Curated annotation (Swiss-Prot):
It is found in: Cytoplasm. It comes from the Bacteria. It comes from Pelagibacter ubique (strain HTCC1062). This is tRNA-specific 2-thiouridylase MnmA. One of its GO terms (biological process) is tRNA wobble position uridine thiolation. GO terms for cellular component: cytoplasm. Catalyzes the 2-thiolation of uridine at the wobble position (U34) of tRNA, leading to the formation of s(2)U34. Disulfide bonds join C115-C211. The keyword DNA-binding does not apply. Residues 161-163 are annotated as: Interaction with tRNA.
């Protein structure tokens, strides 16, 4: 029987073709170098997702023009083949349009989840298959554990970098094909490896902004793609009294305190956004407390239904904590009862399910928050 290589495939590394998704950042560049140094046949692929402009070209964003050049420089240094796929139309249809629709519906979207689901793990997945690759390798900070031809996803050991929340919409077929070499590393360890390998991106800052949203200015992006799609409306208190006027619901998100446009002797927060009435409802912090969440469009990636008999946890925002919960699933919907109070839960965000076992916190799946 052929021994498994370092990424769990029964082939000699030199006979194993891996596609590395190279964004031009330190993580994916380090992964490409690790694969090359271990003797794998490596092709790096970088996605061009949007047309750069003076407004969107930023060092804080991923997949910008400079990032593509950085990825190519790393590939050249490693002497690996490098391809650029031009996915601007796919990205607009699968990510930007969804982002705009969600904001206009009074939600707070997560375009990175949609990007992973559509462009990266669907279109890039298909390209890797077309090239007869054995695996698609990325620089995400998540762990994957394979037993008996079944792969499960776990939180990365670097909890400050863990990206499992953004990957809950992965399918089982995709997960079985994906590899995450950084899941057992801390970010500082990744940078140290990059320095040891003399990669030019070793100290490159991490991307922070949403790639197509310059400086966090959502309104300008929506105005660009959907001119005149939002308008002024009323701001009301919890008693239904009009206390101000807003310039468009897209400028607000649940839990927001600053920049609301109204003041009171006590702090006010955005409690609810009613899109069909073009209204913003504000209230005190206690009005943001929730213990019940309704979800839609579930995606379950565990094959073991016994996982749901374990102690369960959920995460309701990318930077949030794990909260103990009970989960009642009904087809593609779910009701989640939080065993601890949480503030500022926003429709449009994801609620991701975890179960703790001997390997860590296993990702069971998740869904989109309706209310």
């Amino acid at each position: 029987m052929t021994k498994l290589n370092s990424i769990g495939i029964a082939k000699d590394p030199k006979d194993t073709l891996v596609i590395v998704a190279m964004s031009g950042g330190v993580d994916s560049s380090t992964v490409a170098a690790m694969m090359k140094n271990e003797g794998y046949n490596v092709i790096g692929i970088t996605l061009k997702l949007y047309n750069d402009s003076k407004e969107t070209a930023s060092s804080k964003q991923c997949c910008a023009g400079q990032d593509i050049m950085d990825a190519k420089r790393v590939a050249d240094k490693l002497k690996i083949e490098h391809k650029i796929l031009y996915y601007q139309n796919k990205f607009k249809e699968g990510v930007i349009d969804n982002f705009i629709d969600s904001y206009l519906n009074g939600e707070t979207p997560i375009p990175c989840v949609q990007c992973n689901k559509t462009v990266k793990f669907t279109d890039l997945f298909e390209e890797a298959k077309r090239l007869n690759a054995d695996a698609l390798v990325t620089g995400h900070y998540v762990k994957s554990i394979t037993e008996k031809d079944n792969t499960d996803m776990y939180r990365g050991i670097d909890l400050n970098r863990d990206q499992s929340y953004f990957l809950f919409n992965t399918t089982k077929d995709q997960l079985n094909f994906l590899r995450f070499p950084l899941g057992n590393l801390l970010k500082d360890e990744t940078r140290n490896i990059a320095r040891e390998l003399d990669l030019n991106v070793a100290d490159k800052p991490d991307s922070q902004d949403i790639c197509f949203v310059p400086n966090g200015d959502y309104a300008s992006v929506i105005e660009k793609f959907r001119p005149n799609s939002f308008s002024k409306g009323n701001i009301k208190n919890m008693n239904g009294e009009v206390i101000g006027v807003h310039d468009g619901i897209i400028n607000y998100t649940i839990g927001q305190r600053k920049g609301i446009g109204v003041s009171d002797k006590n702090p006010l927060y955005v409690v609810k956004i009613i899109a069909d009435k073009n209204e913003i409802i504000v209230g005190a912090k206690e009005h943001l407390v929730k213990t019940k969440i309704n979800l839609k469009d579930l995606n379950i990636i565990t094959n073991d239904q016994n996982d749901f008999k374990n102690e369960l946890f959920v995460k309701v925002r990318s930077t949030g904590r794990l909260i103990k919960a009970k989960i009642d699933i009904n087809d593609t919907n779910a009701n989640v009862n939080l065993l601890e109070e949480e503030h500022g839960i926003a429709p449009g965000q994801a609620c991701v399910f975890y179960a703790k076992n001997n390997n860590g916190y296993k990702v069971l799946g998740g869904g989109w928050i309706k209310s």
